[in-house]
Amino acid sequence: MKWAEFRVHTTQEAVEPVSNILHELGAAGVAIEDPQDLVTEWSVKYGEVYELSPEDYPDEGVMVKAYFPMGATFKETIAEVRRRVHNLVSFQIDIGHGTMDYTEVKEEDWATAWKSFYHPVQVTEQVTIVPTWEEYSARPGEIVIELDPGMAFGTGTHPTTILSLQALEQAVKQGDAVIDVGTGSGILAIAAWKFGAESITALDLDEVAVNSAKANVALNSASDFVHVQQGNLLDDVASESADVLVSNILAEVILQFTADAYRVVKRGGLFLTSGIISSKREAVEGALKAVGFLIQEVNELDDWVAIVAQKPSQA
């Protein structure tokens, strides 16, 4: 079968929604070429950069590559990708150039090409993300999360995911009940379990993401503890049921459910939000305060923000 390498030239802000679109429409693998990886202060991320060459990266913006079979429905699939990517603008997401093209590639080439972008990366003091095909020996006390990036929505190395993992690492206590809204790959839910949470619910509206999360949860032998469900944000979630609520999704989506988040978090509990571009920090902080949350901490990495908000104990 013939395969196509489909390329989207976009912005860092749009990387995750663009990647999600590609996965939802059947991409067999997705790779991200971000020149920011060449200059980021990697000591902040704890990890090591592997084989990064400036020649492989665009001069500006981010290149997202996906691999599709060139079958009977290929043209329709590509047309739908273009439509959905351009539609991100209606959600106030800057897609930058937004140019898209594709080239034909041999099956043996694409099958290994995208894997070269993924290696073990230590993203917090305790956590290392390891692709399933890599042999890796954990250090004493190290927490290893295995992911299959070929099907993942968020592979652990995007700044928003790193910020979320760092916040979870500090927030989760032994025996906590944790809810992950917009779970994607399931990485945050898996991490919450490894940090000591007793009951973890992972929610996503998208069926492809739900299946991806379930597979990654199984890879980490966490299926008995992490319950992945299809659902729209916090609809039908019981009040005061989460010690920690975490959500790494776009600011525009977070703004839609701050009141529901306040309802679901227990008194004294925490709401950890990321996926927030710096320019939208004030809007999210304002919405959280408006429903009663207290802002405890704000952390930044590159142009992204994570907010730790607490529901008052006497709420």
Curated annotation (Swiss-Prot):
EC number: 2.1.1.-
GO MF terms held by the record: protein-lysine N-methyltransferase activity
Superkingdom of origin: Bacteria
One cellular component term from this protein's GO annotations in UniProt: cytoplasm
Residues engaged in binding S-adenosyl-L-methionine: 161, 182, 204, 248
Keywords from the named record: Cytoplasm, Methyltransferase, S-adenosyl-L-methionine, Transferase
GO biological process, one term: methylation
Pfam families: PrmA
Annotated catalysed reactions: L-lysyl-[protein] + 3 S-adenosyl-L-methionine = N(6),N(6),N(6)-trimethyl-L-lysyl-[protein] + 3 S-adenosyl-L-homocysteine + 3 H(+)
Principal location: cytoplasm
Phosphoprotein keyword on record: no
Disulfide-linked positions: none
Location in or out of the cell: Cytoplasm
Protein's job: Methylates ribosomal protein L11.
Protein family membership: Belongs to the methyltransferase superfamily. PrmA family.
Protein name as it appears in the record: Ribosomal protein L11 methyltransferase
Organism in which the protein naturally occurs: Shouchella clausii (strain KSM-K16) (Alkalihalobacillus clausii)
Gene: prmA
